[in-house]
Amino acid sequence: MAIKTEAYVDTSALIAFLDRSDSFHPLFRRLFSSPPPLVTSALVIAEGHGWFLRRYDRNRAIQFLNFIDDLSVLAFQPFDHEELTKTGRLVKKFGDQSLTMADAHGLVIINQRRIATCWSTDRHLGLTGAKLVISPEGP
């Protein structure tokens, strides 16, 4: 089966794009200027909202949600009991890593959808073989 052209987008990529002080901002600004179909976890949206709320304020957190609403190329994978079970298994499989549930759910999605490219600054998201856009080979 052919590898799909969609990419997985992690919290760190969303933050890097929206926060000009992030060292990866130029890379993600370029990538988001013409994005392929993107997919993410519902947990990533919760994590991103929380990051902007804690780091900045309610207004920036709402701006983050508005950006997500306007990002028409972004699809969401819900997080239900079945996803919790799969994600928990992966956290245990990589017990030597400090994986959050959001990161582990991202790995589950990457594997299920056979995604080859991951937009993330978090090297954990490459554990199962997806190419990170920050790697030397680049996007």
What are these model-derived regions, one by one?
Residues M1-T40, L53-N66, P136-P139:
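Short, well-structured N-terminal submotif of metal-dependent ribonuclease cores
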Residues P37, V73-A75, K131-L132:
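Conserved beta-strand segments of alpha/beta enzyme cores
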Residues A42-L43, D103, D122-R123:
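Short secondary-structure boundary segments
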Residues L14-I15, I45, L125-G126:
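A generic structural signal for short hydrophobic patches within well-formed alpha-helices
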Residues M1-K4, L107, Q112-P139:
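Acidic, PIN/NYN-like endoribonuclease modules and their adjacent C-terminal/linker elements
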